Amino acid sequence: MKFSEKWLRSWANPQVSHDELVARLSMVGLEVDADLPVAGAFSGVVVGEVLSTEQHPDADKLRVCQVSNGSETFQVVCGAPNVRAGLKIPFAMIGAELPDDFKIKKAKLRGVESFGMLCSAKELQISEENAGLLELPADAPVGQDVRTYLELADYTIEVGLTPNRGDCLSLAGLAREVSAIYDVPLAPVAVDAVAAQHDETRPVELAAPAACPRYLGRVIRNVDLSRPTPLWMVERLRRSDIRSIDPVVDVTNYVMIELGQPMHAFDLAEINGGVRVRMAEDGEKLVLLDGQEITLRADTLVIADHQRALAIAGVMGGEHSGVSDSTRDLFLEAAFFDTIALAGKARSYGLHTDSSHRFERGVDSQLARKAMERATRLILDIVGGEPGPIVEQVSEAHLPKVAPITLRAERVTQMLGMPLDAAEIVRLLQALELTVVADGEGQWSVGVPSHRFDISLEVDLIEELARLYGYNRLPVRYPQARLAPNNKPEARAALPLLRRLLVARGYQEAITFSFIDPALFELFDPGTQPLTLANPISADMAAMRSSLWPGLVKALQHNLNRQQSRVRLFESGLRFVGQLEGLKQEAMLAGAICGKRLPEGWANGRDGVDFFDAKADVEAVLASAGALGDFSFVPGEHPALHPGQTARIEREGRLVGYLGALHPELAKKLDLEQPVFLFELLLAEVVDGHLPKFRELSRFPEVRRDLALLVDQDVPAQDILTQIRAAAGEWLTDLRLFDVYHGKGIDPHRKSLAVGLTWQHPSRTLNDDEVNSTTQNIVTSLEERFNATLRK
């Protein structure tokens, strides 16, 4: 909620400084996100009047103007497209200082002298409008200081409200808070009933009373929309971050900001028959005020006539029934819509308006008539017209009702940590316009006004007491708790350890959204139905991820597009598998690498990463819990990975993850030119390991044998190593694959695997006969199982 401080002080004016007011608002829960001057720092700028203009003799786009400051006439060269005789504008005379220390001096533009400058709103930092000069009203007093005339000694304050405080989405609500905080009088705007000048009405039917229990309408005839919106209203709207459109729309927006009641005005000539508040027909079409055509769903509340929908209730009006320059008669609407009925509807159509923002958070159910009278009076004052009687339809059974709440003094003491005086409790609650009636010793019955729809429980009342009394005045008491010993198994590798390990290996941690673009989901997990959000932040964040890879690859792509040629990212987080029925949320650890193997340097940084670099990182992660031997890498398939560079990561036969190169077709669709390698692991399987087993270092020599084995191309090296370990006996201390060869001198259907085996006995020296016998057993077992032979 953004508003003018000067406007707020016209309702409730505590004798405190701007800074103190801002600080106090934040302290009572109305957190101030921003407070800025309404204009830049400038001086020497007055209201000027352009008396005449003529073409510059040496520039097509410049005009030579004669400008009056009320006492003298000055020649000013101006290039603004809207400069014309009779226009009143901000005139910066010689010696004036504009924002950013820009001083106005006598100048010569293309040979013509200029004695000052005519200013746009942007040049004075009043707004971002820069299409031409800031046009002032025709009755602006020539010669008056612009800061005085526009009342620029003001601040715009923006408060970030929690969803339950919809009552503060208006000047009236904020003024009530300020009045209560500082115990100063509240001076609301006077709203009197406007007498009808004719009998014309339009019948109103509530076909969906649960969604719209109250609807008011009024016909106003013979309005003149050629009249401008007065400057005071335009300025108050601008300082509330609302652009002036036309007098009628400006009035409805003004009343919304002032009182908190969203309103809408229809062109009466476009309403066929009466007004029906109903649910939309499934598939019904409506062109909105912003020009987009939408297809309505049956769960959407609409304002309609007897032929078609006119507006999405509480969200946006339709284009064909909207007010235009040719409108002469209005149908003015004010209604109360149920919060639940409108919740999420705007977002479901890709919309968000000031009206929907308020109705979704709650609007005073008793406010509509007051807002109707206020808007009617403003419209009559600005564009004239003849008002008719108000037509109101109400379903009392569906209006919200709040029963009195019992407040106990002992409960207040218990929750605040200190007693509050009974008189103080009554004073604070009455300051918020709550009715308080004593109901026994230390107990009250509290009535809640219709605008405080966030208060329904005793704890809500106690929260209000704490806010107004001051959180900073409550006693500080530290919580007392028993510290329990850490029962985490010693064999468990915690996630922080894995994070540090990957960082040490050159990775950087990424955090990406759990919801992704459905199109990206389909690329990584084709054929799987994603779990979609009913009310996503945006259309490209509508699917819950079934893998961490989509977010990681997008982050990697983002870095590559910003001249980062070597990228190594990892992420830990949840993936979501299945639909709501039987949904699995699994903690995962994933990584993505591309670019050079090592940072650029004189002795390295030339070779790119490959499959085995990613595999080495995965092995380091798996080894962190001391259970690397439980895992194996098995050739596999995954739709997002290269068909020839994909490994299933298994733990004792259970699938725990995947490792591989990004599929070339997927890389092409994502415009990734460099090879990208990915891994993803089930975190629960990775962190559970084994305690290390300690044994005495052997004092006896090691014995090593190297074997060059010829096997078929399709035999995984992992299977060979597993078989060797099984046949090598208990004294095998190290086994390494140090070479893979296929080419000249080798059958094209075979490959050569060179492995090194190291044995060491803890209490004696192994002799050659023992080692040779074991080696022969290994060769025999490999020959029997894999048709392996020694390379000669």
From Swiss-Prot:
Keyword RNA-binding: yes
Residue sites binding Mg(2+) per the record: D454, D460, E463, E464
Alphabetical keyword list: Aminoacyl-tRNA synthetase, ATP-binding, Cytoplasm, Ligase, Magnesium, Metal-binding, Nucleotide-binding, Protein biosynthesis, RNA-binding, tRNA-binding
Ranges where the tRNA-binding domain occurs: 39-147
PROSITE patterns: B5, FDX_ACB, TRBD
EC annotation from Swiss-Prot or TrEMBL: 6.1.1.20
Keyword DNA repair: no
Enzyme class: ligase
SUPFAM superfamilies linked: Anticodon-binding domain of PheRS (SSF54991), Class II aaRS and biotin synthetases (SSF55681), Nucleic acid-binding proteins (SSF50249), PheT/TilS domain (SSF56037), Putative DNA-binding domain (SSF46955)
Alphabetical list of Pfam families matching this protein: B3_4, B5, FDX-ACB, tRNA_bind, tRNA_synthFbeta
Stretches assigned to the B5 domain: 400-476
Required cofactor(s): Mg(2+)
Swiss-Prot/TrEMBL GO biological process terms: phenylalanyl-tRNA aminoacylation
Subunit-level organization: Tetramer of two alpha and two beta subunits.
HAMAP family: Phe_tRNA_synth_beta1
Protein family (similarity comment): Belongs to the phenylalanyl-tRNA synthetase beta subunit family. Type 1 subfamily.
Official protein name in the record: Phenylalanine--tRNA ligase beta subunit
